Amino acid sequence: VVEKFAALSQAASVVASPQLRNRGTIGGNLCQRPRCWYFRGDYACTRKGGDTCYALGGENQYHCIFGGGACVIVHPSDTAPALIALDAKVRIVGPKGARVIPLEQFYVLPEKDATRETVLEPGEMVLGVIVPAPPAGQRSGYRKVRARGSWDFAMAGLAHAVTMKAGKVASARLVLSGVAPTPWRLPAVEKL
């Protein structure tokens, strides 16, 4: 994992605290709920089906700068951006059977449905993650900026998977963390 999937290794190494990393799962990290104090508090906010995002006019220094709209939560996972940069898929199982989808399609923006973070249906759960073998010449990584040295969410982070051929960038996947309701891919930058 360290050699072939450095982005995942680096992201997993900065999740929460050592105690939580040793007990948690990738599925749990992918599916964790947002950390917005209005959502976590007693407010009937947009995320809970109300008609107001209290963070828009209140305490919002840790909320999104991209893709918010009706709800400005940020997605808290460190591993999701890394896995999306690595073009991973997620295996989902539930009462209606199993399915596999690209992890990039797993998350739901508030503009589509402000009450959901993922496409999981009732009774479904993440069974596993499928990460394809990296192409020759690919290098990946993850860097996270946070207020404290450990056990803190990303204020911003970047996962990258860049493939080089003949000394030139053949392809790049760049995904931000801590700045949007979902891991935020940068397709315009990838094309440069």
Which residues make up each language-model segment?
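C-terminal structural segment of proteins
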Residues: V1-L192
